[in-house]
A protein has these predicted regions:
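Long, positively charged amphipathic alpha-helical accessory segments at protein N-termini or as interdomain linkers
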Residues: 6-145
Length: 145
């Protein structure tokens, strides 16, 4: 659930890692945005780029827009804005998808992503009907071959 996608194709990957700065928790956020890749340069067939989507941009303006949007969402998180999670769920490309999750203990969970809890936990129902609420793991959408 940490990718930005256009029509099912990955445009941007986002990584977040919790760290401790003394007694203050913090999160380090990194993002990789495919801006000018051509079809031949794509790392995987289910990726895309702003260039391939016909989206023109000026690099500095793009950076300002991304950082402004990130600041807005972080402010919503910090203030417990009740619209944040419904907004997120409305655009989630993961909810409703069959997924494979590699958990921190290297076990695999297969199931359907049913939702995201208000605290950000991904809700995955496995094949036995058990609902798992996950705080960490590597989530992959299962695609038909």
């Amino acid at each position: 659930p940490n990718d930005l996608v256009i029509d099912g194709r990955k445009l941007c990957g986002i990584l977040a890692e919790a760290v401790s700065l003394g007694d203050q928790p913090a999160v380090v956020i990194g993002l990789g945005l495919n801006t000018s890749l051509t079809k031949d340069e794509l790392p995987v067939p289910h990726a895309t780029s702003l260039h391939l989507e016909g989206i023109s941009y000026e690099r500095n303006e793009l950076a300002v827009r991304v950082l402004t949007a990130l600041h807005h969402r972080l402010t919503q998180w910090e203030t417990n804005d009740p619209t944040l999670m419904p907004d997120y769920r409305a655009v989630s490309a993961t909810i409703g998808q069959n997924v494979r999750v590699i958990l921190p203990n290297d076990t695999e969970l297969l199931g359907t992503a049913e939702g995201v809890a208000d605290d950000g936990r991904l809700q995955v129902r496995d094949q036995t009907g058990t609902l798992h609420e996950l705080t960490a793991g590597d989530v992959t959408h299962l695609r038909l071959q």
